[in-house]
């Protein structure tokens, strides 16, 4: 049980939902520069497994690390935190 709690959990925005059962999530993190103290923004894209194809473009989602599902997928969708507003 403690093993499961050590998995990485990220919150990010869905930037692509064109693949079947797969979404691309953009995760932005901030790190403080060691010498100057300025906060620098880093971003990385992760492919995540979405079994029911429920996440849509622009949604804020939570993803969790899991076993390798394909050559590039290492995360799965946990929940949709906020749905995108389509205008």
From Swiss-Prot:
NCBIfam families for this protein: PRK05610.1, uS17_bact
UniProt function note: One of the primary rRNA binding proteins, it binds specifically to the 5'-end of 16S ribosomal RNA.
Subunit structure: Part of the 30S ribosomal subunit.
Gene Ontology molecular function terms on file: rRNA binding; structural constituent of ribosome
Presence of the UniProt keyword RNA-binding in the record: yes
Alphabetic keyword roster: Ribonucleoprotein, Ribosomal protein, RNA-binding, rRNA-binding
The protein's name in its UniProt record: Small ribosomal subunit protein uS17
Pfam families: Ribosomal_S17 (PF00366)
Domain of life of the native organism: Bacteria
GO BP, one annotated term: translation
CDD domains, per the entry: Ribosomal_uS17
Family classification: Belongs to the universal ribosomal protein uS17 family.
A GO cellular component entry from the record: cytosolic small ribosomal subunit
Database matches in InterPro entries: NA-bd_OB-fold (IPR012340), Ribosomal_uS17 (IPR000266), Ribosomal_uS17_bact/chlr (IPR019984), Ribosomal_uS17_CS (IPR019979)
């Amino acid at each position: 049980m403690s093993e499961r709690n050590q998995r990485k959990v990220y919150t990010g925005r869905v930037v692509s939902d064109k693949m079947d059962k797969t979404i691309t999530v953009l995760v932005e993190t901030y790190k403080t520069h060691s010498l100057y103290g300025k906060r620098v923004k880093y971003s990385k894209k992760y492919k995540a497994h979405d079994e029911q194809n429920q996440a849509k473009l622009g949604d804020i989602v939570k993803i969790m690390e899991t076993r390798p599902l394909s050559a590039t997928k290492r995360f799965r969708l946990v929940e949709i935190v906020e749905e995108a507003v389509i205008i």
